[in-house]
């Protein structure tokens, strides 16, 4: 190993900036600065720390057979990969449509005895059906508390019922809004 010190040679001139005409009038000197090696100095060729091979965190233990198949598949060209996919689809009797998750939800059951997949509703609408005249003020206050509507807009909302009060909200929010409006005297439904 060569030298373990770093040398930098620099020329130091006067602190003022000389002009081109007077550049030779200032004395200059060359200074060498040496930095010690960060591995213990001297001419030691041994390192105090050694790098070790670490496996990536996402590495998966796989049998040799699987590793061999994986490396062979990864070396295929696009055309060969397409042919392999077609071959495996024919061999196992599957089609790309049968693998799509949306196709499973839309497809009808194969036999008449199987129950259809029921999709759970995630978005709800709160509908104000009726507001008795004796509780209009309380309902307007409840509407303003649940929304950011001004007094005029809240008043217009409870006229000409039934009207959707809130749309596309979660079940918990819909239940809370229904409870608040019913306590104020309105007749409310969740759709």
UniProtKB/Swiss-Prot annotation:
Q: Does the keyword Ribosomal protein apply?
A: yes
Q: Keywords on this record?
A: Chloroplast, Plastid, Ribonucleoprotein, Ribosomal protein, Transit peptide
- Keyword field contains Ribonucleoprotein: yes
InterPro entries recorded: Ribosomal_bL12, Ribosomal_bL12_C, Ribosomal_bL12_C/ClpS-like, Ribosomal_bL12_oligo, Ribosomal_bL12_oligo_N_sf
Mark out the transit peptide: 1-58
Query: Where does the protein end up?
Result: Plastid, Chloroplast
An annotated GO cellular component of this protein is: chloroplast
Chief location category: plastid
Any one Pfam family here would be Ribosomal_L12
Q: Which domain of life is it from?
A: Eukaryota
Q: Its Gene Ontology molecular function terms? A: mRNA binding; structural constituent of ribosome
What biological process terms from GO does the record include? translation
User: Family per UniProt?
Assistant: Belongs to the bacterial ribosomal protein bL12 family.
HAMAP family membership: Ribosomal_bL12
Name-wise, this protein is Large ribosomal subunit protein bL12cz
Q: What organism is the protein native to?
A: Arabidopsis thaliana (Mouse-ear cress)
Encoded by which gene?
A: RPL12A
């Amino acid at each position: 190993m060569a030298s373990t010190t770093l040398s930098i040679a620099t020329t130091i001139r006067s602190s003022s900036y000389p002009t081109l005409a007077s550049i030779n009038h200032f004395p200059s000197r060359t200074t060498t600065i040496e930095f010690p090696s960060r591995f213990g100095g001297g001419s030691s060729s041994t390192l105090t720390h050694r790098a070790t091979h670490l496996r990536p965190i996402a590495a998966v233990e796989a049998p040799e057979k699987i590793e061999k198949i994986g490396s062979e598949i990864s070396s295929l060209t696009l055309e060969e990969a397409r042919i392999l996919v077609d071959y495996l689809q024919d061999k196992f009797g599957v089609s790309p449509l049968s693998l799509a998750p949306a196709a499973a939800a839309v497809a009808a059951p194969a036999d008449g005895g199987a129950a259809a997949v029921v999709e759970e509703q995630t978005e709800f609408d709160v509908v104000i059906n009726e507001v008795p005249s004796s509780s209009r003020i309380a309902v307007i206050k409840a509407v303003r508390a649940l929304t950011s509507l001004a007094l005029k807009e809240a008043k217009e909302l409870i006229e000409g019922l039934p009207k959707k009060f809130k749309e596309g909200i979660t079940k918990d929010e819909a239940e809370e809004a229904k409870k608040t409006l019913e306590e104020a005297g309105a007749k409310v439904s969740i759709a």
